[in-house]
Swiss-Prot record:
Species per Swiss-Prot/TrEMBL record: Agrobacterium fabrum (strain C58 / ATCC 33970) (Agrobacterium tumefaciens (strain C58))
KW Oxidoreductase (keyword) present: no
Protein name stated in the entry: Mannosylfructose-phosphate synthase
Pathway: Carbohydrate metabolism; mannosylfructose biosynthesis; beta-D-fructofuranosyl alpha-D-mannopyranoside from D-fructose 6-phosphate and GDP-alpha-D-mannose: step 1/2
Pfam families: Glyco_transf_4, Glycos_transf_1
Domain of life: Bacteria
A Gene Ontology biological process term: disaccharide biosynthetic process
UniProt EC number: 2.4.1.246
Induction: By salt.
Family: Belongs to the glycosyltransferase 1 family.
Keyword annotations of the record: Glycosyltransferase, Transferase
Catalytic activity: beta-D-fructose 6-phosphate + GDP-alpha-D-mannose = beta-D-fructofuranosyl alpha-D-mannopyranoside 6(F)-phosphate + GDP + H(+)
Length: 454
């Protein structure tokens, strides 16, 4: 990593140019200072890049977060005094799903380079996010002759394997919907061409080495993070006030996020049916979807409601849509249990936020986060495809008061100790600047052995 030991020169004269400039690239979805979380392709990754950008700004850098401009979006969006969203047009005015956006990125790169040169901008390095932005990031890196660090967030080979295992009868349709062949071809080129690949979990690191053929020295592991100034536990009295505001009664199980098949809300409903048979006070609250759902999202929501009806759970399951960003910490606190039931999940930002808020959490085994936690100490994990396993696991904190208290207390402690955005931004800068720094997580020590005597 010798080429990262010296930051690039600064030649512009504006006030902000006293600080080194970084280019983050996240091309798909609705990237904004206040994004409509839950909208198409707008979820945990958007939160990730925004929080990373903010922390890099607080650490003394000026950050331009590049994305695609479409619909009626403005060219710029100011996040704070050090961070702005820069929107570059390509592919017309309509929304384009992330699976097919790469076909328009040559135009995007040409427009981005034109913008950078026109404004005499000099960047120390590029950090791209997801494979579509990786295509763009590598082209800009080569044109500008600056380092390119790529964060995949999700891996095509891993996702394809998971989906073919979970839905073998639908395997023939996946290529048309998810464009795996082109995606994996581009991933192979990006990962071998960029200066460093940043894995967010040990699962990703393993796949990058074993399936993509990368050398270990070409990969650095930095986990996702959360904002510890927003997500933290509160007193019981405050929590009861929050519950009243949301109208929560009984023992509330919460799930939230985008309306997508891979999120496994249908599996959660099945598992909840097992819990509801054993715990009469159990209630399920699904805060899923966005303000303006597309046809596919509407279909998924209708299917979920039909599933609830077929199981006779209408009086125990509530649906709400978009949760405003300012309400996220409180809805986590209001719940008695949070469940991440994804069919596949590279990490699971929502689970970390829930743990940080003091809410006991159940995590899918089909992803990276469960390897970071100690079962029964920080959180619980289950196989969402096994409704009995998921249902019984959800029941445990409600039946064992000591376990509930431990998960609330130690889950929040685990999140604070390993997953704050400040530590993650510092890891990225240490990597770029060639400084030696203790990893946020050693891949061999993601979860210490469980100890009942905490």
């Amino acid at each position: 990593m010798e080429k990262f030991t010296k930051m690039g020169p600064m030649t512009t004269t504006s006030e902000t140019e006293r600080y080194p400039r970084i280019a983050l690239i996240s091309t798909h979805g609705y990237v904004a200072a206040h994004p409509p979380l839950g909208a198409a392709d707008t979820g945990g990754q958007v939160v990730y890049v925004l929080e990373l950008a903010r922390k890099l700004g607080q650490l003394g850098y000026t950050v331009d977060l590049y994305t695609r401009r479409f619909e009626d979006q403005p060219e710029f969006d100011e996040v704070d005094e050090r961070v702005r969203v820069v929107r570059i047009p390509c592919g017309g005015r309509d929304f384009i799903p992330k699976e097919y956006l790469h076909r328009h990125l040559m135009e995007w790169c040409e427009n981005a380079l034109r913008f950078i040169k026109k404004n005499d901008l000099n960047y120390s390095f590029i950090n791209s996010h997801y494979w579509d932005a990786g295509v763009a990031g590598q082209r800009l890196s080569e044109a500008l002759k600056i380092p390119h660090l790529h964060t995949p967030h999700s891996l095509g080979i891993w996702k394809k394997r998971q989906m073919e295992t979970d839905y073998p009868e639908k395997a023939d349709t996946f290529e048309l919907e998810f464009n795996f062949k082109e995606r994996i071809q581009h991933e192979l080129i990006i990962y071998r061409s960029c200066d460093m690949v940043i894995a967010t979990t040990p699962v990703q690191l393993d796949v990058l080495i074993e399936d993509y053929g990368l050398k270990r020295k070409h990969i650095h592991m930095i986990p996702p993070g959360y904002d510890d100034n927003r997500f933290f536990p509160v007193s019981d009295a405050t929590r009861q006030m929050i519950r009243q505001r949301f109208g929560f009664e009984g023992k509330v199980v919460l799930a939230l996020g985008r309306l997508a098949t891979n999120k496994g809300y249908d599996l959660l409903i099945d598992g909840f049916s097992v819990l509801a048979e054993r715990e009469p006070e159990a209630r399920l609250h699904l805060a899923v979807g966005g303000e303006n759902m597309d046809e596919q999202e509407t279909t998924i929501l209708n299917q979920l409601k039909e599933r609830v009806k077929s199981l006779g759970l209408e009086d125990k399951v509530a649906f709400s849509g978009y949760v405003a960003d300012e309400d996220l910490p409180d809805i986590y606190r209001a719940a008695d249990l949070f469940v991440l039931s994804s069919r596949y999940e590279p990490f699971g930002m929502t689970a970390i936020e829930a743990m940080a808020s003091g809410t006991p959490t159940v995590v899918t085994i089909h992803g990276g986060l469960f390897r970071a936690i100690s079962y029964g100490r920080h959180a619980l994990f289950a196989d969402p495809f096994d409704k009995e396993d998921l249902g019984i696991t959800m029941m445990k904190p409600f039946k064992h008061e000591r376990l509930y208290g431990r998960l609330s207390r130690m889950g929040a402690h685990k999140a604070r100790s390993l997953f704050t955005w400040t530590g993650i931004a510092q890891q990225l800068l240490a990597l770029v600047e060639g400084r030696t720094m203790m990893p946020v997580l050693e891949e061999a020590d993601w979860a210490e052995p469980w100890n009942d005597g905490d």
